[in-house]
């Protein structure tokens, strides 16, 4: 499934894109696309719906982030070999984790706010894994069972803040709107992540 949140900022409704590309309203079946909606049992119910019977949404509404009410926005630094080389850094032996503020989450085509004194605004296209089942101390073999789906994320950074004003990743990456995602989440069952070449 391709799940979306559509409508004016702060008034988004849940929806899905059917196989023909038609936007369909899910409001009668789920209040919003949050952690509860992305839990395995809820996703199974949504997958069982006949998309053709859902109300069609006319026009081309704005798409918001395909998930709301997140508890954490976790990212991994230097996660691509080419990016590590580009920055002149070695491949880290352990992943570099950092958090982006939840307020950095925004829709895929929403304006990105440039902070005052910004000098080196940068962006990186990433693939985001949306966790649908609470996960803690999960084995590598079981990890993908906690993923609800995937979407595109634009990891926006202010490199001047990040590298020249204290070396803090949070300072350079957590400004409001610095995490546009979407336009939709594709559920895990429809993505062969091992073939994604990322």
Regions found by a protein language model. Name each.
Residues 1-95:
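N-terminal non-catalytic cap/leader segment that marks the start of a structured domain
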């Amino acid at each position: 499934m391709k799940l979306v949140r559509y409508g004016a900022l702060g008034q988004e409704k849940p929806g899905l894109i059917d196989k023909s590309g038609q936007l369909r309203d899910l409001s009668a079946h789920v209040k919003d696309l949050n952690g509860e909606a992305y839990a395995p049992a809820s996703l199974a119910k949504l997958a069982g719906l006949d998309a053709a019977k859902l109300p069609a949404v006319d026009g081309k509404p704005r798409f918001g982030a395909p998930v709301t009410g997140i508890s954490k926005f976790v990212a991994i630094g230097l996660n691509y070999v080419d990016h590590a080389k580009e920055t002149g850094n070695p491949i880290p032996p352990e992943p570099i984790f950092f958090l982006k503020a939840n307020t950095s989450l925004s829709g895929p085509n929403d304006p990105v706010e440039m902070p005052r004194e910004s000098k080196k605004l940068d962006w990186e296209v990433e693939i985001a894994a949306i966790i649908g089942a609470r996960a803690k101390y999960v084995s590598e073999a079981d990890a993908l069972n906690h993923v609800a789906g995937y979407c595109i994320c634009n990891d926006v950074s202010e490199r001047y803040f990040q590298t020249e004003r204290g070396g803090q990743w949070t300072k350079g990456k957590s400004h409001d709107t610095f995490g546009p995602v979407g336009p939709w989440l594709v559920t895990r069952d429809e993505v062969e992540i091992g073939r994604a070449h990322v």
